[in-house]
Amino acid sequence: MHYQNERTSGCRISDAWTYRGLKTVIIENESIRVTVLADKGADIYEFIHKPTDTDFMWRTPWGVRDPQKFIPTTGWPEGIWHDVYEGGWQTLAPTGGSPMNYAGAEIGQHSEATTMPWDVQILEDTPDRVSAKFWVRTYRTPFYIEKTLTINAGESVLHVEESIVNEAEESSDAVWGQHIALGAPFLSDTCRL
């Protein structure tokens, strides 16, 4: 067991949480709180602006479901992704969009990385800055994906750094994108983007 700082002010980070059975990381400062579902694609499930108590992320009516505990009842290729989609913000890689055949492997809606558990390591944990690295190796495709999330004191900004590496001996095409679903209460009749 490792020791983790438990501050009540400044920047804070903890990977000692689970939500609906999924390993969860909470990253925050005085202005924002970001909740990441490490065991489900390292999805950003919650992005809250604390001074106004506003969550920017849209959420499905059924909420968070653990893809490791779900057995699809159909062969519908879009099915598993939609069945466990909670809303929020996903990293799409190495494919995105509709199901496809990728070098002979069947890949479902929005790729495989969005439903896989990712590893996590806290890189920095100080009152001025917190940072966590998430990474995964995909099952059906030869890719290593890494993202680092950082929050600095005094900022209402989540810094995101991502990379994708083809670990195969031959070149491979890849799609790499962000699936960000904004919703109420942030999106309203008075919202301007």
Label every model-predicted segment.
Residues 1-159, 170-173, 177-193:
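Surface-exposed acidic/polar loop and edge beta-strand patches at domain peripheries
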